[in-house]
Design a protein with these regions (language model features):
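Short low-complexity, flexible loop/linker segments enriched in glycine and/or proline
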Residues: 81, 106-107, 156-161
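Generic recognition of short, well-ordered alpha-helical segments
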Residues: 76-80, 106, 136
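Short loop-to-alpha-helix "cap/lid" segments that border enzyme active sites
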Residues: 102-115
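Glycine-rich phosphate-binding loop signature in dinucleotide/nucleotide-binding domains
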Residues: 5, 61, 114-120
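A short, conserved beta-to-alpha structural element at the edge of catalytic cores
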Residues: 38-46, 148-163
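Alpha-helical substrate-recognition element adjacent to the catalytic core
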Residues: 2-101
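Acidic, Mg2+-coordinating phosphoryl-transfer loop and its flanking beta/alpha structural elements
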Residues: 111, 118-158
């Protein structure tokens, strides 16, 4: 049962939704993948204008929640990046450092937990599998299609549970 006295939440992914990760894809193209370097380069991600505009617009009516597959060890860099780009404050849900489940499982679990007490107005994410599962579970989804899709990132999201 959601608490109608609190505003609804709008849930935003980070990588390739708000943050352009194209400059760090090269770390996923080698074998083995260089995850530490991939995440270490995240503070240098340029923001996507489309995503930033949507977060700001959503913040007029909703509480913002950030839902990322980034590991918890990246929290400080992530919070600094959000602040540096003037994004609205909001709770940041991150993957446990040792959690290797697919993004669609971890994110849907958190969405369902949020929905127990709040109206989830929208999920904005670039991962098609996350979006498909969220829609099947009854959530309203906006697919962030403004990033160039990376086959390496897609494989990492699904098979390696790393972003």
């Amino acid at each position: 049962v959601s608490d109608s006295s609190r505003p609804p939440v709008a849930v935003f992914d980070l990588d390739n939704t708000l943050a352009d990760t194209a400059h760090r894809q090269r770390f996923l193209e080698r074998r083995p993948r260089h995850w530490d370097a991939f995440f270490a380069a995240a503070p240098h991600d340029p923001p996507f204008v489309e995503g930033v505009a949507l977060v700001r617009e959503s913040a007029e009516e909703c509480e913002i929640v950030y839902l990322t597959g980034r590991p918890e060890r990246c929290r400080r860099d992530t919070l600094d990046w959000l602040a540096a780009h003037g994004l609205p404050e909001g709770a940041v849900h991150m993957r446990g450092n040792a959690d290797r489940r697919p993004a669609r499982r971890t994110k849907l679990e958190i969405l369902r937990r949020l929905a127990r007490t709040r109206e989830v107005r929208v999920l904005v994410d670039d991962d098609e599998l996350v979006c498909d599962d969220a829609e099947r579970a009854g959530f309203t989804v906006l697919r962030a299609r403004w990033a160039a899709r990376s086959a390496e990132l897609r494989a990492a999201q699904e098979r390696e549970g790393r972003t």
